Amino acid sequence: MKLSENEASKLIEKLWFRHTDSTIIAVLQDYKTKEVLMVGHMNREAVFKTLTTGYVHFWSLSRKKLWLKGETSGHFQLVEDFKIDCDGDAMVFLVKSVGPVCHTGNRSCFYRNFSDLI
């Protein structure tokens, strides 16, 4: 799913970039199974690139730079649809994954149970 640059710009003006580094929270969810795959941060540029290219982009809080999810691994996340929360400070992207999402090689970043950590 892609929006025009004009549509993306209008939508971005309605968002509230209030989190660290002027970001919103971005949740990736499998578009078929609805499994939560990962959570990241997006600044205005990341949202714009995501909406206009159809490929998920994030803002790296640690590296302070934009990154295309899958640019190194080839495991791109293709946007099928998206939703915006009631406050406008978070988005859920329903995605089609090209390979595992997590850098560990797991399909989802949410693969650990609490018992694994205690």
UniProtKB/Swiss-Prot annotation:
Mg(2+) binds at residues 85, 87, 89. Its cofactor is Mg(2+); Zn(2+). It holds the Pfam family PRA-CH. It catalyses: 1-(5-phospho-beta-D-ribosyl)-5'-AMP + H2O = 1-(5-phospho-beta-D-ribosyl)-5-[(5-phospho-beta-D-ribosylamino)methylideneamino]imidazole-4-carboxamide. Signal peptide: none annotated. Binds 1 Mg(2+) ion per subunit. Pathway: Amino-acid biosynthesis; L-histidine biosynthesis; L-histidine from 5-phospho-alpha-D-ribose 1-diphosphate: step 3/9. Zn(2+) binds at residues 86, 102, 109. The keyword Endoplasmic reticulum does not apply. Its EC number is 3.5.4.19. GO terms for biological process: L-histidine biosynthetic process. Keywords: Amino-acid biosynthesis, Cytoplasm, Histidine biosynthesis, Hydrolase, Magnesium, Metal-binding, Zinc. Its main location: cytoplasm. Homodimer. Belongs to the PRA-CH family. Catalyzes the hydrolysis of the adenine ring of phosphoribosyl-AMP. This is Phosphoribosyl-AMP cyclohydrolase. The lineage of its organism: Archaea, Thermoproteota, Thermoprotei, Sulfolobales, Sulfolobaceae. The gene is hisI.
